[in-house]
């Protein structure tokens, strides 16, 4: 009977039996756990299919590596495509159209409408369709590039092995030469406040509210806070953002741009309480929430009552249960995985990119790291200049920047010059009746080299890429000023700001 026991256990492990009716006399019962019949052999195994992970997997396959991508969620694309960048941009775009139609903007353009009605369900449907199309697109790209997709929770179970645990408890083992961790990040919890994604929500819940709240309080006036706050403010909510810092827009934004940005948002109806901290939140019997706040430095307490509380205090690396401790890979004080310039951990064939390593938590930063990392695996050069990674806030007007801010240049003791140009003096902005904001260029005083570009205005998120290219190739302000820009375009404001920085005077202002 002992030999039967061994055979039975082996068959159960391989998934051939889930149970044997009435048992076998003398055979001990073993827990059900099924395994794939054969491990998968791979050159590169990527854990995570967000912007960094899926791009890295495709690039690895294109370079000739046998590639596997392990993803714990049912759909590919990670936070960005499913509950982040993509759905938020759909809502930002559509809420902006509604705001224009519902307010006085359309009437001022000669477009008169008898009734404008919000169909929130339809708006959410359009958002979901965009997400579905893009996540499905990644699945198609995986097939096209012969990337093997394994759906399951990936854990590193050896320096050359990843085990994916599927929803049904079965596992798939991947024997691999290289491992790339691209597991992204998760919402940072607020101490003492429990997120239920109903009335106390994270960014995920804020993307799927069933109705427009009468009053919305946002904890945090960084990028995510002002974007999602703008969505619901445009759709009719009374929105107040409570920010611990003394400015809006988060880390890295130029202070002059931030002040102008805040002024424009306030003109739209967005309210801010800066230098203020949230000390707690209590749900009342009527379903509303009392949010307790006070000055960041301490002081008199105040209570704001709202229908929905949105917590936007940042994100933290997602590294739990990856098997790092067992491998001796220690995290830094901020929970990130330490890597060298080739994105290698202390174990040379295990790499990490994106939100789990140092640097800004941006999708495009993760994409760049993913491509460069696998090129390095193939023997290529590995280089990325984080000073050339742009940041964008997709409100209206948009805010975008790349390179150094004035505050950073002052802190580093670098002598610089400034060139500015307002969109109010730009012909295309005038014809569009969309003139809020400006372009601000920072150039090195001694060399004229572009050190930073800060844009507040329509199309800023597109325009900043011209600035990123200039920084990447070491262009001077004069170089940009002498490039012919099409007329009439918003990008002429970028040229004019560089004219002002290089020659001390723009043409049209």
Curated annotation (Swiss-Prot):
The active site is a redox-active disulfide bond. FAD binds at residues 71-80, 89, 154, 183-185, 355, 361-364. Its main location: mitochondrion. InterPro entries: Class-I_Pyr_Nuc-Dis_Oxidored, FAD/NAD-bd_sf, FAD/NAD-binding_dom, FAD/NAD-linked_Rdtase_dimer_sf, Lipoamide_DH, Pyr_nuc-diS_OxRdtase, Pyr_nucl-diS_OxRdtase_dimer, Pyr_OxRdtase_I_AS. The active site is at residue 487. This is Dihydrolipoyl dehydrogenase, mitochondrial. GO terms for molecular function: branched-chain alpha-keto acid dehydrogenase activity; dihydrolipoyl dehydrogenase (NADH) activity; flavin adenine dinucleotide binding; pyruvate dehydrogenase (NAD+) activity. The lineage of its organism: Eukaryota, Metazoa, Chordata, Craniata, Vertebrata. PANTHER family: DIHYDROLIPOYL DEHYDROGENASE, MITOCHONDRIAL (PTHR22912:SF151), DISULFIDE OXIDOREDUCTASE (PTHR22912). NCBIfam families: lipoamide_DH. It is found in: Mitochondrion matrix; Nucleus; Cell projection, Cilium, Flagellum; Cytoplasmic vesicle, Secretory vesicle, Acrosome. It comes from the Eukaryota. GO terms for cellular component: acetyltransferase complex; acrosomal matrix; branched-chain alpha-ketoacid dehydrogenase complex; mitochondrial matrix; mitochondrion; motile cilium; nucleus; oxoadipate dehydrogenase complex. The record marks 448, 473 as: Important for interaction with PDHX and activity of pyruvate dehydrogenase complex. Keywords: Acetylation, Cell projection, Cilium, Cytoplasmic vesicle, Disulfide bond, FAD, Flagellum, Flavoprotein, Mitochondrion, NAD, Nucleotide-binding, Nucleus, Oxidoreductase, Phosphoprotein, Redox-active center, Transit peptide. One of its GO terms (biological process) is branched-chain amino acid catabolic process. Homodimer. Part of the multimeric pyruvate dehydrogenase complex that contains multiple copies of pyruvate dehydrogenase (subunits PDHA (PDHA1 or PDHA2) and PDHB, E1), dihydrolipoamide acetyltransferase (DLAT, E2) and lipoamide dehydrogenase (DLD, E3). These subunits are bound to an inner core composed of about 48 DLAT and 12 PDHX molecules (by non covalent bonds). The 2-oxoglutarate dehydrogenase complex is composed of OGDH (2-oxoglutarate dehydrogenase; E1), DLST (dihydrolipoamide succinyltransferase; E2), DLD (dihydrolipoamide dehydrogenase; E3) and the assembly factor KGD4. The modification N6-succinyllysine is found at residues 66, 104, 122, 132, 143, 159, 166, 273, 277, 410, 430, 505. Belongs to the class-I pyridine nucleotide-disulfide oxidoreductase family. Tyrosine phosphorylated.
